[in-house]
């Protein structure tokens, strides 16, 4: 039985569901996620040390980031709308002996059920795959406790991002399957910061994520013209 979600693109869900069995293959289509994951984890930890924290990973997919945060000592819940990806995530966590609570639920639904329940919320490489990213940002803001942190990452919408993230990554270097990204769904940093402020979050840090095709390595930089990450914080309760 197929479940229909209001803020989900069926084509996007099908695309990632078809690849679900390859999530944990470091040489598969998900190789970039495996390679950037240590950078993402260190960046999150530099702002919000995870040990002992309750964390929800929104759009967790096969659980690459979720597992690494659990290994860092967090109590992690991973949510996604791809049932196949969640099965892979659950099986891998069992095999690895890493405790992660996975659930097929929309961010908006979890926010309605458990508002203000998490110290940290992560939503990485996900916003560019949904019809209404602002709705997801609002849900993340609702999920986090006052004084807690919400982390996002996505792709800038400009000519350089189109050339590198779509043409370069998908058609020239073949790092990603063709059709992985829809340029129209890319989000400018100013737009994402606006979504965050409207939702009651305070943008605190903006970093770029760059890939060097000569070295095959990724690095965090101050160039946010293609891939970028933004750290936000929910103000303390008055």
UniProtKB/Swiss-Prot annotation:
HAMAP family the UniProt entry points to: UbiG
Catalytic activity: a 3-demethylubiquinol + S-adenosyl-L-methionine = a ubiquinol + S-adenosyl-L-homocysteine + H(+); a 3-(all-trans-polyprenyl)benzene-1,2-diol + S-adenosyl-L-methionine = a 2-methoxy-6-(all-trans-polyprenyl)phenol + S-adenosyl-L-homocysteine + H(+)
Protein EC: 2.1.1.222, 2.1.1.64
SUPFAM superfamilies: S-adenosyl-L-methionine-dependent methyltransferases
Phylogenetic lineage: Bacteria, Pseudomonadati, Pseudomonadota, Betaproteobacteria, Burkholderiales
GO biological process, one term: methylation
Gene name of the record: ubiG
NCBIfam families: UbiG (TIGR01983)
Keywords carried by this UniProt record: Methyltransferase, S-adenosyl-L-methionine, Transferase, Ubiquinone biosynthesis
Pathway(s) the chain acts in: Cofactor biosynthesis; ubiquinone biosynthesis
InterPro entries attached to this UniProt entry: SAM-dependent_MTases_sf, UbiG_MeTrfase
Family, similarity comment: Belongs to the methyltransferase superfamily. UbiG/COQ3 family.
Cited Pfam families: Methyltransf_23
Protein name: Ubiquinone biosynthesis O-methyltransferase
Molecular function per GO: 2-polyprenyl-6-hydroxyphenol methylase activity; 3-demethylubiquinol 3-O-methyltransferase activity; polyprenyldihydroxybenzoate methyltransferase activity
Binding site for S-adenosyl-L-methionine: 40, 59, 80, 124
Signal peptide: none
């Amino acid at each position: 039985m197929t479940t229909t979600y209001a803020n989900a693109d069926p084509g996007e869900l099908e695309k990632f569901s078809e690849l679900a069995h390859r999530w944990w293959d470091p040489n598969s289509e998900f190789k970039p996620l495996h390679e950037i994951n240590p950078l993402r984890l260190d960046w999150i930890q530099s702002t919000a040390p995870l040990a002992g924290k309750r964390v929800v990973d929104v759009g967790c997919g096969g659980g690459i980031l979720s597992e690494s945060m659990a290994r860092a000592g967090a109590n992690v819940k991973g949510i996604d709308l791809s049932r196949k990806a969640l099965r892979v995530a659950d099986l891998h966590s069992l095999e690895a002996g890493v405790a992660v609570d996975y659930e097929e639920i929309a961010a908006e639904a979890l926010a309605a059920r458990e508002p203000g329940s998490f110290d940290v919320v992560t939503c990485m490489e996900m916003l560019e795959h949904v019809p209404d990213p602002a709705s997801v940002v609002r849900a993340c803001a609702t999920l986090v406790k006052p004084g807690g942190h919400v982390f996002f990452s996505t792709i800038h919408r400009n000519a350089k991002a189109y050339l590198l993230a779509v043409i370069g990554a998908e058609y020239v270097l073949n790092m990603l399957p063709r059709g992985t990204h829809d340029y129209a769904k890319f989000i400018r940093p100013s737009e994402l910061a606006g979504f965050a402020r409207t939702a009651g979050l305070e943008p605190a840090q903006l970093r770029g994520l760059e890939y060097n095709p000569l070295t095959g390595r990724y690095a965090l930089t101050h160039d946010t013209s293609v891939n970028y990450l933004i750290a936000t914080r929910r103000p303390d309760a008055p």
